[in-house]
Each structure stands twice: as C-alpha cells, then as structure tokens.
C-alpha cells in the first residue's frame, strides 16, 4: 500500500470505520480522518448536504496537510458517493490515492445496524447507498464484499491486496 492517501468508502455498517482503525495500527505514521467526526464539529444536521461539503473540504485540507508533512498514509473514511468523492479529490489536490469500497448484502447490513448502540441505523437508506456504490464504481478502486465477515477478516482481506 504505497499511496499516501487511502479512501475507504461504503454504506453505514459496511465496516469502514473498523477497517480504518485497523489499517491505522499497521502504519507507524498514519492519520485517520473520519468524515463523521468533521461533521460532528458543527451543530450537525445529518441531512444537510452543504454541511457535508464543508466537512469534505475540511477533511481534504487536513489530508493534504498531513501528506505534505510526511504523515502517511492518510486514511479517510466516509460514504463517498460519486459526487462527494469527486469533490473531495478535487479539494485534496494532486495526491496519489487508493480507493477501497466496502459492499455487503442486506442480511449483513440488517445484523450490523441492529448491533449499533448509536449512529445511522436506517436499513432502507443503507441499502440504497450500497446499491449506488455498487452501480457507480470509482476508477481503479478495490472492491471488498464484507458480507458475513468479521472486522478481523475484513482487515486481513485488505492487507492481502
């Protein structure tokens, strides 16, 4: 994994945050940026697309700064629907990146969302997001089906690629 920027995208419950945390542990100078944390810095309205764009821009600038200072890889976690991904990459500038897209089946999402104590738990919207990502792959992305997989299995799958 030689890219200074690793983008992990997927629907809620796909395993993005867990993979991001596990990957960060594997690199001595990595940084982990979760868009939910950037959004949470505001009086967040989770349905407000303008707030999401502000958070995307802030995260892109943070990622760019970390990379410029040699803090790599920078692992960025969000849903990253196509328009959001394009906006983030434009704001981040000319940084080599790798995209990892996590997809899963409905049964897996149902189980994972039911286990959540907080956060996004709308199964119907989650499945819709998952299908958008499945139907609109990013160029040169690595797609991982996390259906029925544990956090450790998902981390092992990406380490092997």
Sequence positions of predicted segments:
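Small-molecule kinase domains that catalyze NTP-dependent phosphoryl transfer to phosphate-bearing small molecules
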Residues: 118-157
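Glycine-rich phosphate-binding loop used to anchor ATP phosphates in small-molecule kinases
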Residues: 54-94
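Walker A (P-loop) phosphate-binding loop of P-loop NTPases
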Residues: 13
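Pre-Walker A (Motif I) flank of P-loop NTPase domains
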Residues: 2-5, 71
């Amino acid at each position: 994994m030689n890219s200074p920027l690793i983008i992990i995208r997927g629907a809620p419950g796909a395993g993005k945050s867990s993979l991001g945390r596990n990957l960060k542990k594997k690199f001595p100078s990595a940084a982990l940026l979760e868009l939910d944390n950037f959004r949470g810095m505001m009086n967040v309205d989770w349905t407000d697309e303008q707030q999401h764009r502000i958070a995307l821009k802030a995260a892109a600038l943070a990622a760019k700064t970390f990379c410029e200072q040699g803090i790599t890889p920078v692992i960025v976690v969000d849903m990253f629907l196509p328009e959001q991904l394009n906006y983030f990459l434009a704001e981040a500038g000319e940084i080599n990146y790798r995209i990892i897209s996590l997809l899963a089946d409905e049964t897996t999402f149902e189980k994972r969302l039911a286990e959540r104590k907080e956060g996004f738990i709308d199964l119907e919207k989650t499945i819709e997001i998952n299908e958008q990502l499945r139907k609109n792959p990013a160029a040169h992305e690595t797609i991982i089906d996390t259906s029925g997989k544990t956090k450790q299995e998902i981390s092992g799958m990406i380490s092997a690629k």
